[in-house]
Amino acid sequence: MSQNGKIIPNLDQNSTRLLNLTVLQRIDPYIEEILITAAHVTFYEFNIELSQWSRKDVEGSLFVVKRSTQPRFQFIVMNRRNTDNLVENLLGDFEYEVQGPYLLYRNASQEVNGIWFYNKRECEEVATLFNRILSAYSKVNQKPKASSSKSEFEELEAKPTMAVMDGPLEPSSTARDAPDDPAFVNFFSSTMNLGNTASGSASGPYQSSAIPHQPHQPHQPTIAPPVAAAAPPQIQSPPPLQSSSPLMTLFDNNPEVISSNSNIHTDLVTPSFFGPPRMMAQPHLIPGVSMPTAPPLNPNNASHQQRSYGTPVLQPFPPPTPPPSLAPAPTGPVISRDKVKEALLSLLQEDEFIDKITRTLQNALQQ
């Protein structure tokens, strides 16, 4: 299909997943399978000492993958802002909490991060998959099974047995050394269905940052209630955009695709998408772009811009304060730059302090 002499890729669900898997395997050859995909996410990091959020230079498509070696499960964000992709291991010490459309988590390095999802349903589905994976680790800790084929490293990592992870998540139904407990064998029986339904199939033009309409009913995990101020307004997506498996790097940097014009009109306020993050009473909108990397050149004409593909991306804003389980309050006093400045100014106003400085300088010069 072509429009204005430009070639538009026409990929179905399987072709898109295969292409995404090929790109991921260039980064990590041990990746075997993509379990689920989120079309667009933005990352924030939480400073525990200052109790405030700051924007990380990470945004793009999120992929939860299964690997053929340790660690068995990871999630990867193909970063559109720079060449550094974000990779996190899904191990037993991974903690998370959902406050849609945010997923807050603490990793093995004790860093507290927040993931903002464009699609709140994808946030819930990713959280459900995280829960299935982490529950497998907790099951192994409660019911350890001896396996002569496991290495010492695997024993220390306290991961689920190979049959638990490989059996239900693999396309093949056969597995070696399958445990006797049927609950282990069927533990991830619906994981692939979750990944597949979240990636609805459609033939037609495909764009890398299109956030699709998905007809299936999402899984509903047990999550914390969403924050009222963080509820995004509903934005209708154009009907032709249906695939939620975004096409990654091969098309994201193509200026021909990025600069295409169309019939989608957006009436948006002037964005502050790339300024320092701040708390807002209600979310703002930014113009719909294929790969959001810069504000519009002429903000006054932003409402007149026309794009052929993609939908307006909601203005991300700092997530809510993480719960004490993820970010405990600091126990000691916080020393900030302003407090140091105030202390020095108060010392300079004391004559005794000035006399001590003067005597010290005189003694140093005499020596």
UniProtKB/Swiss-Prot annotation:
Biased composition (Pro residues): 315-331
GO CC annotation terms, alphabetical: cytoplasm; extracellular region; P-body
Enzyme Commission number(s) of this protein: 3.-.-.-
GO molecular function: enzyme activator activity; hydrolase activity; protein homodimerization activity
Keywords per UniProt: Cytoplasm, Hydrolase, mRNA processing
Polar residues composition bias: residue spans: 196-211, 299-309
UniProt main location, coarse: cytoplasm
Gene knockout outcome: Lethal phenotype at the seedling cotyledon stage, with disorganized veins, swollen root hairs, and altered epidermal cell morphology.
Superkingdom field: Eukaryota
Tissues/organs with expression: Expressed in seedlings, mostly in root tips, root hairs, and the vascular system. Also present in roots, leaves, stems, and flowers.
Alphabetical list of SUPFAM superfamilies matching this protein: PH domain-like
InterPro entries assigned to the protein according to its UniProt record, in alphabetical order: Dcp1, PH-like_dom_sf
Matches recorded under CDD domains: EVH1-like_Dcp1
Family, per entry: Belongs to the DCP1 family.
Quaternary structure note: Homodimer. Component of the decapping complex. Interacts with DCP2 and DCP5. Interacts with BCHA1.
Annotated protein name in UniProt: mRNA-decapping enzyme-like protein
